[in-house]
From Swiss-Prot:
Organism lineage string: Archaea, Methanobacteriati, Methanobacteriota, Stenosarchaea group, Methanomicrobia
This protein's name: 1-(5-phosphoribosyl)-5-[(5-phosphoribosylamino)methylideneamino] imidazole-4-carboxamide isomerase
Protein's organism: Methanoculleus marisnigri (strain ATCC 35101 / DSM 1498 / JR1)
Pathway membership, UniProt: Amino-acid biosynthesis; L-histidine biosynthesis; L-histidine from 5-phospho-alpha-D-ribose 1-diphosphate: step 4/9
EC number: 5.3.1.16
NCBIfam families documented for this protein: 1-(5-phosphoribosyl)-5-[(5-phosphoribosylamino)methylideneamino]imidazole-4-carboxamide isomerase, PRK13585.1
Length: 239
């Protein structure tokens, strides 16, 4: 199982939010410095979120993200504010390995098929942000149907992987809820990366044993509640 530290960027700075709220941001400083630190500690890749894009400022941080993507030369997946095929293509052409499309994939599901046909499914990840079994879109404000049904649909449209975020536990550093993860893994064949609430090597091990392909570490990693080497050891045990 792969481990992807989150590098969430708001107004040019690395931040962590609680429950997706910008007013609850904790600022950690230079995103590039954090990216290099996590890679030096052995991360399998980076999970980059352009929060300004998610909040409607699509191109903000673009130069910064492009620069450290080129510098690090590591696997990078990116989400946040991807509202069109053109947005996604711009990031993929800039060197991002995989784009994450969430709200727009629900609004315009055929976008997944178009991107998969043009760039290959392995570079297209559908984001599934769920609360109480419902996909949440538009900043986690509006429910849009069963997360399991959407997962199956995205898979059928050609998404090469899924990012599952449990909104109920995201940013709280209180541990994962494994049941919805196992239900999702039983319904799809594509790799599933899990985000939200991962706060200990035990959480990582539970996801590994369930069959998740990867885990995104965010708030607990930056707060020092979990150390990256310990998470990596749990992720790669038995390999």
């Amino acid at each position: 199982m792969e481990i992807y530290p989150a590098v969430d960027i708001l107004d040019g700075r690395c931040v962590q939010l609680v429950q997706g709220r910008p007013e609850a941001a904790t600022v950690y400083g230079d995103p590039a410095a954090w990216a290099h630190r996590w890679l030096d500690e052995g991360a399998d890749g980076l999970h980059v979120v352009n929060l300004d894009g998610a909040f409607g400022r699509a191109r903000k941080n673009a130069d910064l993200i492009r620069a450290f993507t080129r510098e690090t030369e590591t696997f990078t997946e990116l989400g946040g504010g991807i509202r069109s095929v053109e947005d996604a293509a711009g990031w993929l052409d800039a060197g991002v390995d995989r784009v994450i499309v969430s709200t727009q994939a629900v609004r315009e599901p055929e976008m997944i098929r178009t991107l998969a046909e043009e760039f290959g499914g392995e570079r297209v990840m559908a984001g599934i942000d769920a609360r109480a079994g419902e996909v949440m879109i538009e900043g986690w404000e509006r429910p849009a149907g069963s997360y399991l049904s959407w997962a199956e649909r995205f898979e059928s449209l050609g998404a090469g992987s899924l990012l599952y975020t449990n909104v109920d536990v995201e940013g709280l550093q209180q541990g994962i809820a494994i049941e919805p993860v196992t239900e999702l893994l039983a319904r799809v064949k594509v790799p599933v990366v899990v985000s939200g609430g991962i706060s200990s090597p035990g959480d990582v091990a539970a996801l590994r044993d369930a069959g998740a392909a990867g885990a995104v570490l965010g708030s607990a990693l930056y707060a020092g509640k979990v150390r990256l080497p310990e998470a990596m050891e749990a992720a790669h045990a038995n390999e």
